Structures are given as C-alpha cells and as structure tokens.
From Swiss-Prot:
Oligomer and partners: Homodimer.
Enzyme class: oxidoreductase
GO molecular function: glutamyl-tRNA reductase activity; NADP binding
Organism lineage: Bacteria, Bacillati, Actinomycetota, Actinomycetes, Micrococcales
Protein's name in the database: Glutamyl-tRNA reductase
Pathway(s) served: Porphyrin-containing compound metabolism; protoporphyrin-IX biosynthesis; 5-aminolevulinate from L-glutamyl-tRNA(Glu): step 1/2
Residues engaged in binding NADP(+): 196-201
Residues marked Important for activity (site): 97
Stored Pfam families: GlutR_dimer, GlutR_N, Shikimate_DH
Active site (UniProt): 46
Gene from which this protein is expressed: hemA
Length: 450
C-alpha cells in the first residue's frame, strides 16, 4: 500500500474554482468504498482542497480516477476539468507537502496559525467518518507534531499574521488609519456585523476583541449564533434574522464567514443600507463568497476578499522561513525512516513464521511421545522462551536496516541462510511466542506452563 495526495490550491487555480472543488470534495467519503482507495482524508481551507489517500501501489491511478470522479459528481464542473485541476504527489512528496502546509509555509499568508488546526480537524473528521487508514493517521499526526515544533522553536508566525489579521489591516488602510491610536479609536467606535460562524469566524471575533472592538453583532442563518457567542465569552451580540436588516444599515464593517450557497447581491446590500452614504467596509472571508464581487461598485463601499488578502500578505523574515524549512526537512526524514522501518514487518513475520514452524513440529514430536507431562511442559516453556530471545535481535536489526534503506540486505540474508522469501505484503502485528498449554506465574514472577 502507498500514500499519495491530490492537490488543488491557490498556486494553480483561482479561488472560485477552489471553492467549487472544495464543495465537491464532500463526495469523497461516501464514494470511498468503490474508489479503489483504502483510506482518504480531505483537507479544505480558504485557498486549497487536498485529498490524501492510500491505495495499493499498482492501483494509485485507478484510485485517483475514482476519487476525482466522486468530486466531479458533486460539482457542476466537467469530469475532465476536475481531473486536470489536481496535481498528484507520490508518497515522499506528499509527506513534505503536508508538513509544509501544516506549518504555514505554503499558505497565502506565510506562517499563518490557523492552518495547523485545520490539518488536525481534517484528520479528526476523517476518523469520525471512518475513512482514515492507519498510514494516513500516522502521516497527519506527524504533520501536527511538526507544526508544534516549528511554532515552539522558530519565529515563523510569531507576529500572529493570519488571513483575518491581514484582512483587518487592509480595512484600516482603506480608511486611511495609519497610526495605532486612530486604528484603536476606529474599532472601539465601529459597529460591526459578523455573518456566519464558519472557518474564520472564531479567529475574527478574537481579532476584533484584540483591536478594541466593542459593538459586534453575529448572525448565523443556521441558528448557531447564540452558542457561538456564548462559547467565546458572550461579549458580542447574537442576532436573529429579523435584526439583520437593521444591523446592515448601521454597520461600519460587515464580515462574511458563512460560505453559504447564496450571495448578497449589490441590489440587496444597497436596499438594506436604505440608500445611505455611510462608508462601509465589506470583508468577505468565505471561500465560496458571501458577497457578489459587484458590491465593490456601490458608492462608499470597499470590498476586501481572500484574493485581496493573498496579494497583500506580508513576507515573513527569511531567517524564520529558513529555520522552519530546516525543521520540516528533519521531520520528513524522520517520517520516512519510520515508514521504512515499518516495511521490515513482512520480513520479520516471515522469519518468525519459519522459526515457529520448526519449533511447533519438534514440540508435536515431544507431546506425541511424552504427552503433557511436567518434563515435556518444562521443555516447551524453555524452548519458546529461547525462541523469543533468539528472534529479538534479528527483529531489531531488520527495523534498523529498513530505516537505513538497506532492507534488501536483510531479505537477501533470509533467503540465503534459511530459504525464506519475505512476502511483499503488509504484516500484521507480531507478538510474542505463545505456549500451546495454559501458563501461570511461578513464585519469582516468571511464566510457567500449567
């Protein structure tokens, strides 16, 4: 089995296309059984949709086709367009890519902190849906550990830059607020409406609080506003549907984070504003857009989108980026070594099976001649303990050689010395050698045959 990934992101596609692919990726889980893949985890953020999957080595292309056909079936995009939108990464490239994504090196805002949580939640969602295979779990857990290491040992992201912070910085710039005092005065006096409780809503509310905002209304079409506000200190105001029109009319800033199917049109926004000329800043953080881009043409309305954020994102210090990349390099090599070590399982099991076969045949002869006498049981106990001890060092060496990329030497030795051909399939967990008869502990705590 091998791990691979299908990647579509802001590097290659416009965000509208990414949004449509992201919506289609919800079809991956239900389609998994017939896709040819043994497992899948979908990572969808504001600027990427990526499918991490596991399949038999010879079946990767078939699994790729099956997964992307599931995406296409859940979108209005032609099948061939969906297939062309995704790049395919092999196992080694997949690990490096996910680790770089998880630490924020591949983000529109380099070093952003939200992405690590999104990687973690993607794995959790796949585990709850039953689509995360063991190798995918290990891959994502390694990526999460790497993100923590980068956060602890480098200055990447130390400035707290994120999609939300850059968007709010842009809002300040558009209003000509150049000094800290003016910026804080603006947020303290501004009336703000947050629409939706989507991916960036929690971070947005926290950022607004940090900047001194005091008047924030939150509306959720799905009715989650009250719980959302309560979970975050209760300082904002949850708004029902009947209060939204008035909130829009009074707002200085409206922030969209719902990702719903319907967009607010220029006509509807103008109607809700009651034709007023009060300056309004609209920040659209929804990947699928909460606002029609044409609202930017309305008088006294400034529109900030995810594309605006991408273009305005500041560059991280080169030293911090270099340090983060070095940690990613180390983490990728550690992950690869661990995977190579696991590749020794089949050879270890083959040696154990061969050795136990010899032992069991000899024990059958002993039992046939002497039955379960005390002497025979003592012999069996001693031989099984000896076999466990003899197999320990070869098993350790197999893992070590595999981690060093030299497993072929071990397999050649097995074939040359014992005539064992290691099976080319994943091995189940290999335990200790068990006795054929019940066992109990003697007075010194050692197991003995009953």
């Amino acid at each position: 089995m091998t791990v691979f990934s299908l990647v579509a992101s802001h590097h290659d596609l416009d965000l509208d296309t990414v949004a449509r692919l992201s919506a289609g990726a919800t079809g991956v889980g239900p389609a998994l059984p017939g896709s040819g893949a043994a497992g899948a985890v979908v990572l969808a953020t504001c600027n990427r949709v990526e499918i991490y999957a596991e399949a038999d080595g010879a079946g990767v292309e078939a699994a790729r086709a099956g997964l992307l056909s599931a995406v296409a079936a859940s979108t209005s995009l032609p099948d061939e367009d969906v297939h062309a939108a995704f790049r395919t990464l092999d196992a080694d490239a997949t690990a490096r890519h996910l680790f770089e994504v998880g630490v924020g090196l591949d983000s529109a805002v380099v070093g952003e902190r939200e992405i690590a949580g999104q990687v973690r939640r993607a794995l959790t969602a796949a585990q709850e849906a039953g689509t995360a295979s063991g190798p995918l779990v290990r891959l994502f857990e390694s990526a999460t550990r790497t993100a923590k290491d980068v956060g602890s040992h480098t200055a990447l992201g130390a400035a707290g830059r994120s999609v939300v912070s850059v968007a709010l910085d842009l809002a300040e710039e558009l209003r000509g607020l150049t000094d800290a005092a003016a910026q804080r005065d603006f947020w303290a006096g501004a009336t703000i409406l947050l629409i939706g409780t989507g991916a960036y809503a929690g971070t947005t509310l926290a950022q607004l609080a940090d900047r001194g905002a005091t008047t924030v209304g939150v509306h959720s079409a799905s009715g989650r506003a009250e719980q959302f506000v309560a979970d975050r200190g209760g300082w904002a105001l949850a708004l029902g549907g009947e209060a939204v029109a008035g909130a829009v009319a009074e707002a200085d800033v409206i922030i969209g984070s719902s990702g719903g199917e319907r967009q607010i049109s220029p006509e509807r926004l103008q109607e809700l504003r009651e034709g007023g000329r009060r300056p309004l800043t609209v920040v659209d953080l929804a990947l699928s857009r909460d606002f029609d881009p044409a609202v930017a043409d309305l008088p006294d309305v400034d529109l900030i989108t995810l594309e605006s954020v991408r273009l305005a994102a500041p560059e991280q210090a080169q030293v911090a980026v270099a340090e983060a990349r070095a940690l990613v390099d180390d983490a990728v090599e550690e992950y690869r070594a661990a995977q190579r070590g696991r590749s020794a399982d089949a050879a270890i099991k083959a040696l154990r099976r061969h050795t136990l076969g010899v032992l069991d045949r000899e024990l059958e002869r002993v039992r046939a001649r002497h039955g379960c006498t005390a002497a025979a049981e003592e012999v069996e106990f001693a031989l099984r303990r000896m076999v466990n001890q003899l197999l320990h060092e070869p098993s350790v060496r197999a893992k070590r050689l595999a981690a060093e990329g030299r497993l072929d030497r071990y397999e050649d030795a097995l074939e040359a010395v014992f005539g064992i051909e290691a099976p080319g399939r994943p091995a189940s967990e290999v335990g200790t050698v068990e006795a054929a008869c019940p066992a109990h502990e003697d007075e010194g705590g050692a197991a003995r045959i009953a």
